[in-house]
From Swiss-Prot:
Record family assignment: Belongs to the sodium:solute symporter (SSF) (TC 2.A.21) family.
Membrane topology value: Multi-pass membrane protein
GO molecular function: lactate transmembrane transporter activity; monocarboxylate:sodium symporter activity
Keywords: Cell membrane, Glycoprotein, Ion transport, Membrane, Sodium, Sodium transport, Symport, Transmembrane, Transmembrane helix, Transport
InterPro entries referenced in this protein's UniProt entry, alphabetically: Na/Glc_symporter_sf, Na/solute_symporter, SMCT2_SLC5sbd, Sodium:Solute_Symporter_SSF
Induction remarks: Up-regulated by CEBPD.
The protein's name: Sodium-coupled monocarboxylate transporter 2
GO cellular component, one term: apical plasma membrane
Subcellular location: Apical cell membrane
TM stretches of this protein: 10-30, 48-68, 81-101, 129-149, 158-178, 181-201, 236-256, 276-296, 322-342, 386-406, 412-432, 438-458, 505-525
Length: 619
């Protein structure tokens, strides 16, 4: 394969990304040096505005996998990725209206605290451990996979980029906390958009303008976006993307620690919701840029596909190879695109490190040592950031030894997200579900999603369901085509062409629905949770959204939870919501007499104030 090496200006532009990201961490370390509470470090004192949080949310979940993978996906399969714009609408709506209000008003820092308040400690710890394991694994692969693709095309040093990513992310996470992560993400989001725009402008000029791009893409069937085939085995259809994609991304947005931690860092609930809705705009922009990049790339390589001809060895290398071609005479711009790709990586890794440190501190350290001083709590949080930074970087090294297992590791994020979504849905929406149902549902959902996913890796779906659109090598000057003959499998199990051939976008739906169904059944078999024993602020009464329902039907759907009782209204009116100190309620078990006021929360304003007395240590 022909490797086009970086020039000096490319390295300068790329290095600038790391220098500025580190500088933001140093800035917030100096600016916030007198504020040493864990609350300031982990959730920014709950005083963030919606703007930077919205940019941070978008950057955190639009990783280098999106920057490199989505254009390659469009190049091979067409522009059906545009349908994810519909999925994102449902995801943001359900997150902001169903999950966020409960998490924000509760005053929790770790989303898994809710599981102890609603169920018990074993459920909380089981969910936390699953989250930690899958996040470390996923983050390691997110660091390694794009670094490998860029190395093989641009000659950019593989391990230098891997370790630089790990070191820089760990550096600014441990120095500046959540504020540094959010503002660095905002900067990296701008870099991603600028990088995409340069590719779109230069790429469309190379192929004769945007109209020419659309014409060639249309002739190549790349603009066939909507396919209403209801077959769940088809890789991408309208239904798999809008329904399966909603479940997949709701597992990432609705109950993921990285998302919720940013939302609860906002100064009011309104700001948190605005952050989510403005983040929707960011998601649309990034996906649109990625899709159009794929269409331009197809127009450029229409008559000589570098993948089929053997010039590159994997689809993920298409985008870097394309960039090196169109910017061959423009030093610095290839470096800008690599900075764009690594902005996605940096933001994802930083979000993961910060979230991992938060859940570990809140769910394990604080539970074992509830009376830590603020200064010691902050230092422990910083130490956890360093620890998880090392672990995620080490996981990238392990990923290099995995071979074909890398694809499986990338899917674990979705495979775990579905059951976790089901678990929180059981807690928020179904008051009668008890802790046995929750734990049994989680295990059932994990089992189902891993079963179908692992089966699909061992027995790939028939080519008729996953075959890419036609690619041509007709006008290639030099061909080095390697034909791989698929091994003949003597026999396939009965489930291979049905259950194991399910579209990967349904993995989360299988896990979520399996968790919910099992949780409800187990709760009925073991004795339902009595509604009157559950604090109403732990439940989100979905039926209340239907304003035309009579109070009689709404009360019936409350399943005994006293949403209209005077006590609940008193909680909201007097500034009292849950606990007299979150830790007190968690340590004593969830009893009505332990649910008191959260310091600093004003339910009328739905906001947090920094005016509450807080033990602050000055260096």
């Amino acid at each position: 394969m022909r490797v086009k090496n970086f020039e000096a200006w490319d390295y300068v532009v790329f290095a600038g990304l790391f220098v500025i990201s580190s500088g933001i961490g140093v800035f917030f370390a100096i600016k916030e040096r007198k504020k040493t509470t864990s609350r300031e470090f982990l959730v920014g004192g709950r005083q963030m505005s919606f703007g930077p949080v919205a940019l941070s949310l978008t950057a955190s979940f639009m990783s280098a996998v999106t920057v490199l993978g989505t254009p390659a996906e469009v190049y091979r399969f067409g522009a059906s990725f545009f349908l994810f714009l519909i999925s994102y609408v449902f995801v943001v709506f359900f997150t902001s209206e169903l999950f966020l209000p409960v998490f924000y008003r509760s005053g929790i820092t770790s989303t898994y605290e809710y599981l102890q308040l609603r169920f018990n400690k074993p459920v909380r710890y089981a969910a936390t451990i699953i989250y930690i394991v899958q996040t470390i694994l996923y983050t390691g692969v997110v660091v390694y996979a794009p670094a490998l693709a860029l190395n093989q095309v641009t000659g950019f040093n593989l391990w230098a980029s891997v370790f630089a990513t790990g070191i820089v992310c760990t550096f600014y996470c441990s120095l500046g906390g959540l504020k540094a992560v959010v503002w660095t993400d905002a900067f990296q989001m701008v870099v991603m958009i600028v990088g995409f725009l340069t590719v779109l402008i230069q790429g469309s000029n190379h192929v004769g303008g945007f109209n020419n791009v659309l014409e060639k893409a249309g002739n190549g069937s790349r603009l066939h976006i909507v396919d209403f085939d209801v077959d769940p085995l088809r890789r991408h259809t309208f239904w798999t993307i809008t329904i399966g994609g909603t479940f997949t991304w709701l597992g990432v947005y609705g109950v993921n620690q990285s998302t919720i931690q940013r939302c609860i860092s906002c100064k009011t609930e309104k700001h948190a919701k605005l952050a989510l809705y403005f983040n929707l705009l960011g998601l649309w922009i990034i996906v649109a840029c990625a899709v159009f990049s794929g269409l331009i790339m197809y127009s450029h390589f229409k008559d000589c596909d570098p993948w089929t001809s053997g010039v590159i060895s994997a689809p993920d290398q298409l985008m870097p190879y394309f960039v090196m071609e169109i910017f061959a005479t423009m030093p610095g711009l290839p470096g800008l695109f690599v900075a764009c790709a690594f902005s996605g990586t940096l933001s994802t890794v930083a979000a993961s490190i910060n979230a991992l440190a938060t859940v570990t501190f809140e769910d394990f350290v604080k539970s074992c040592f509830p009376h830590l001083s603020d200064k010691l709590s902050t230092w422990i949080s910083k130490g956890l950031c360093i620890l998880f930074g090392i672990m995620c970087t080490s996981m990238a090294v392990v990923a290099s030894l995995m071979g074909s297992v890398v694809q499986a590791a990338l899917s674990i994020h979705g495979m775990c997200g579905g059951p976790m979504l089901g678990l929180f849905t059981l807690g928020l929406v179904f008051p009668f579900v008890n802790w046995k149902g929750a734990l049994g549902g989680l295990l059932t959902g994990i089992t189902l999603s891993f079963w179908v996913a692992i089966g699909s890796f061992i027995y790939p779906a028939p080519e008729s369901k996953t075959l890419p659109l036609p690619l041509s090598t007709e006008h290639c000057v030099e061909l080095n085509i390697t034909t791989t003959v698929a091994p003949q499998i003597s026999s396939r199990p009965v489930l291979a062409d049905t259950w194991y051939s399910l579209s990967y976008l349904y993995f989360s739906a299988v896990g979520c629905l399996g968790c919910i169904a099992a949780g409800i059944i187990i709760s009925f078999l073991t004795g339902k949770q009595r509604g009157k024993d559950i604090d109403p602020l732990l439940i989100r009464p979905v039926c209340n959204l239907f304003c035309f329902w009579s109070k009689k039907y709404k009360t019936l759907c409350w399943c005994g939870v006293q949403h209209d009782r005077e006590t609940e209204q008193d909680y909201l009116d007097s500034g009292s919501a849950w606990k007299q100190g979150v830790e007190s309620g968690l340590q004593n078990g969830l009893k009505q007499d332990t649910l008191a006021q959260i310091p600093g929360y004003n339910p009328k304003e739905k906001s947090y104030s920094n005016s509450v007395p807080e033990k602050t240590t000055y260096f």
